[in-house]
């Protein structure tokens, strides 16, 4: 809920994929790991922070997207459980959209006194890769042939993650 390393984490999604693999968008969605965190626990127990402008941004999103990440739910996980669900195999690359995810996840790991989910040098920025590698790239996005962008539910962690993989693997 902000752009600081101490920000509350609402939710996260990870999709393990083989860079040489062939996947449909739906297959990527189906293999995603989704974690919804308990925001109140983070504020109460770890003094994590909330930015007012981020709350205002969330309030402008669709009801469905807010129900997935922003609203309290029955699937909210403790910070400790959520972090463990995000922990990956050693020497696996994590692609993220910018550096914020790494900062906040590493920070909450410090709060929990557990190791980061992966080494700092295993993180990669998907926007930079797309901008450098794809001819149609613009600000970290590119065209994906035979893919309907309308299928992406913007700001839904799993959909955003799957779309990033689609652009990285199949973008032009």
Spans of features found by a protein language model:
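Short, loop-centered acidic/histidine patches that primarily coordinate divalent metals
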Residues: 97, 110, 129
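Active-site-proximal helix-loop-helix substrate-binding element of RNase H-like nuclease domains
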Residues: 38-46, 52-56, 124-163
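Conserved non-catalytic scaffold segment of RNase H-like nuclease domains
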Residues: 1-96
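Substrate-recognition/cap helix-loop segment adjacent to the acidic, metal-dependent catalytic center
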Residues: 87, 100-121
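Acidic, Mg2+-coordinating catalytic module of metal-dependent nucleases/exonucleases
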Residues: 90-99, 103-104, 141-172
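Metal-dependent nucleotidyl/phosphoryl-transfer cores and adjacent nucleic-acid-binding surfaces
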Residues: 1, 5-9, 15, 77, ...
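Residue-level signal for well-ordered alpha-helical scaffold segments within enzymatic catalytic domains
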Residues: 81, 85, 103, 107, ...
């Amino acid at each position: 809920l902000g752009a600081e390393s101490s920000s509350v984490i609402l939710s996260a999604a990870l999709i393990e994929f083989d860079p040489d693999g062939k996947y449909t968008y739906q297959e990527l969605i189906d293999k995603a790991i989704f974690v919804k965190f308990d925001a109140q626990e983070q504020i109460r127990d770890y003094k994590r922070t909330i930015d007012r402008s981020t709350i205002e941004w969330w309030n402008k999103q669709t009801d469905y997207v807010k129900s997935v990440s922003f609203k309290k739910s029955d699937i909210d996980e403790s910070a400790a459980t959520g972090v463990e669900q995000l922990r990956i195999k050693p020497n696996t690359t994590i692609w993220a959209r910018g550096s914020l995810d790494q900062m906040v996840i590493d920070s909450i790991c410090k709060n929990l006194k557990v190791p980061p989910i992966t080494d700092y040098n295993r993180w990669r920025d998907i926007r930079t890769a797309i901008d450098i590698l794809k001819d149609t790239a613009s600000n970290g996005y590119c065209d994906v042939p035979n893919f309907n962008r309308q299928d992406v539910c913007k700001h839904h962690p799993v959909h955003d993650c799957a779309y990033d993989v689609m652009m990285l693997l199949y973008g032009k």
